Amino acid sequence: MTMRSAVFKAAAAPAGGNPEQRLDYERAAALGGPEDESGAAEAHFLPRHRKLKEPGPPLASSQGGSPSPSPAGCGGGKGRGLLLPAGAAPGQQEESWGGSVPLPCPPPATKQAGIGGEPVAAGAGCSPRPKYQAVLPIQTGSIVVAAAKEPTPWAGDKGGAAPPAATASDPAGPPPLPLPGPPPLAPTATAGTLAASEGRWKSIRKSPLGGGGGSGASSQAACLKQILLLQLDLIEQQQQQLQAKEKEIEELKSERDTLLARIERMERRMQLVKRDNEKERHKLLQGYEPEEREEAELSEKIKLERQPELCETSQALPSKPFSCGRSGKGHKRKTPFGNTERKTPVKKLAPEFSKVKTKTPKHSPIKEEPCGSISETVCKRELRSQETPEKPRSSVDTPPRLSTPQKGPSTHPKEKAFSSEMEDLPYLSTTEMYLCRWHQPPPSPLPLRESSPKKEETVARCLMPSSVAGETSVLAVPSWRDHSVEPLRDPNPSDILENLDDSVFSKRHAKLELDEKRRKRWDIQRIREQRILQRLQLRMYKKKGIQESEPEVTSFFPEPDDVESLLITPFLPVVAFGRPLPKLAPQNFELPWLDERSRCRLEIQKKHTPHRTCRK
């Protein structure tokens, strides 16, 4: 069976006609005339498509379109037959599924088959009724049927616009317009798929896009609403994402600002630290200059004061000869005395003078000979007193900042009274300021590292004049010796003391490792036992209600509330752990059990003790 599209067209009966004539007209239109090319084949599947008689598409008034005039070949209201749109002229409008579609009209010379196959005059006018067509998406083609009754709504008006389909007899007609709905199937299908086409037609009628009248508009509005809602949801989601990104950007900016502020603070602190270090260096450098000036001034003053004394001693020494060897040594001390006086700082000479004068008769190793005179002994004492101040100066090297409190009043006569008072105190005291760490962390090591080379310079400067002093000056100077190190010889196999291979090493240390592991296990067991014992004690104390005494945390440093007495002195006590250190007189250290009598007693006791042996 060839695939083609059959167009059925029927005209409405006259208004005054009988219903029997109308039925005959419909039957004749259904069966076809002599000019019907489809013949009985198309009338054969007419009963199957009785559904096409259902109400057609709405009128132009219902769809809003203008009524389309009938073609020129449709004159007279008597009968309408098969329409072949081969020679139709476009330009007329008709109402379809989606709106008005141009309906091709045949030329005036064509013959239209009506009832009885009467020809229609070419000049006859078209009836004012609109012509409608419907396209069925069946496999044999698109069948277009024009309604022949009053303009009643048709169930087929549920989809989009359908163009007029060309028949198989006139392939030269205009091409059909594309359907917005489901496209028609290929024309190669067989006639056995008519039932499937009917089911698809039902589905099109039931679909929301194929609904006619107000239902189609409402479904389209609902679809548009859903699309709008989806778009709104998408916009909201994108706005939320943008807000989240903006928040992240703001947080990152704030973190960046805080980090920049921290970096600026650190830079400022570093600059302040550098400035402080530079100030300290300037202070130290400035401190050296006034010290040197004061030392030079003091040395000049002392030289002027001591010049007459030195002249007297120099005159007294050659006038009286020495009869003993030791007096000769004292005579030779005249030359180093002059050298030491010129080069050594004489800041501490005056306070030490009184100490040496009081101590020299007791502890001076030089004994007066019977042949020596009084002037000789005085000269020796003066020389010894001037040489002795170098001992504390060289042995106790202090930085110049700590020795500054003794600059001014060194030559003042009050120093003698201070020295006597210091000797009378029962505890150690000093006039130099020293650092006392009282519940404070130790200072940073940076300034100590910076001041260390300066201390070495002062030590070297103090040692130079003492090295010139000669035999009389006793200095605690470390002895530097050069040790010549010989190169190592090639080791002989006999000289190697032990084998250091991995296997030998592991064997040697395996036993020690095992012992260490055992000790560790034993420690863990003891710790567990102690914890168990503590738990049991806690249970017992809880049952008895005994409160366990907590150990008090004590410290060597006394509390300020425990002050016993106040003492205001110009001297600083040497304090250790909050207590002043007692002043001990210099004497030989002796132990009671090292005495001869105690030794004898211990030996006697050992001899008399019987030897006991355990007998079994």
Swiss-Prot record:
The modification N6-acetyllysine is found at residue 355. Residues 552-593 are annotated as: Interaction with MSL3 MRG domain. Residues 81-91, 153-171, 187-196 have a biased composition (Low complexity). This is Male-specific lethal 1 homolog. It holds the Pfam family MSL1_dimer. Its main location: nucleus. It comes from Mus musculus. Residues 1-116, 152-218, 306-422 are annotated as: Disordered. The modification Phosphoserine is found at residues 66, 127, 207, 364, 385, 395, 444, 452, 484. GO terms for biological process: chromatin remodeling; positive regulation of DNA-templated transcription. Isoform 3 and isoform 5 are testis-specific. Isoform 1 and isoform 4 are ubiquitously expressed. Isoform 2 is expressed at low levels in the testis and brain. Changing residue 576 to E: No effect on interaction with MSL3. Reduces interaction. Strongly reduces interaction with MSL3. The keyword Nucleus applies. One of its GO terms (molecular function) is protein-macromolecule adaptor activity. GO terms for cellular component: MSL complex; nuclear speck; nucleoplasm; nucleus. Residues 498-516 are annotated as: Interaction with KAT8 HAT domain. The lineage of its organism: Eukaryota, Metazoa, Chordata, Craniata, Vertebrata. Residues 474-593 form the PEHE domain.
